[in-house]
């Protein structure tokens, strides 16, 4: 299981961070607004995975649930907007030819990750002191990340940062669902056309 966890980490860096960062810059430079808007939504939602890393550094059980939910909502954010998808289909160029396979690939990657993540969901409801081998194996990656990037910052500070960012994310997400969501996307388009 450890090998699978480390493989997931490596893949997430390449397909979940590096590739969309390059695509975002490319979309901005080439002024492809549909791709740019889809990717800014992706980055907003995928920040939940970054928050998960900070929660895992603190060995908080809720991190397992947060990470699993992130793997569900991230692909949704890539496909949800009908207007952007329609605009994307009208666009031409190399970036579109790169973006579309990446979007399918990352969606497949997160679908598989969601299925595999169900094996770790029990960790979300287990006290830290009773973590089994699988739960502890998941913690290895964030703890190594902490040692490399945040070696001088105490774990409680990073954990508090993760909790604060989760609260901020939840407030923004709730605000979006209550105020913005009804006025945009699929439901707004249907309502406007009737």
Locations of regions flagged by a protein language model:
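Hydrophobic transmembrane alpha-helical segments in integral membrane proteins
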Residues: 1-20, 156-163
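Short juxtamembrane and helix-loop transition motifs at transmembrane-helix boundaries
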Residues: 1-6, 25-35
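N-terminal signal-anchor/start-transfer transmembrane helix
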Residues: 15-32, 174-177
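Hydrophobic, membrane-inserted alpha-helices
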Residues: 20-25, 46-55
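Membrane-interface helix caps and helix-loop-helix hairpins in membrane proteins
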Residues: 31, 56-64
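Membrane-interfacial loop-to-transmembrane alpha-helix junctions, especially the N-terminal start
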Residues: 34-43
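Membrane-proximal helix-loop-helix units in multi-pass membrane proteins
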Residues: 49, 64-135
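C-terminal membrane-adjacent module
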Residues: 104-194
């Amino acid at each position: 299981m450890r090998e699978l966890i480390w493989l997931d980490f490596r893949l997430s860096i390449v397909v979940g961070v590096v590739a969309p960062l390059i695509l975002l810059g490319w979309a901005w430079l080439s002024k492809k607004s549909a791709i740019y808007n889809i990717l800014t939504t992706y980055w907003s939602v995928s920040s939940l995975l970054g928050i998960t890393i900070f929660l895992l550094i603190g060995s908080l059980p809720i991190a397992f649930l947060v990470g699993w939910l992130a793997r569900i909502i991230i692909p949704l954010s890539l496909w949800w907007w009908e207007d952007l998808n329609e605009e994307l289909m009208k666009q031409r160029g190399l970036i579109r030819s790169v973006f579309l396979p990446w979007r399918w690939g990352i969606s497949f990657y997160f679908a598989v990750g969601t299925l595999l993540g169900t094996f770790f969901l029990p960790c979300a409801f287990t006290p830290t002191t009773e973590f089994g081998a699988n739960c502890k194996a998941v913690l290895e990656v964030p703890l190594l990340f902490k040692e490399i990037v945040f070696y001088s910052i105490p774990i409680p500070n990073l954990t508090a940062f993760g909790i604060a960012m989760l609260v901020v994310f939840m407030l923004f997400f709730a605000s979006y669902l209550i105020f913005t969501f009804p006025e945009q996307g699929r439901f707004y388009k249907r309502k406007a056309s009737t």
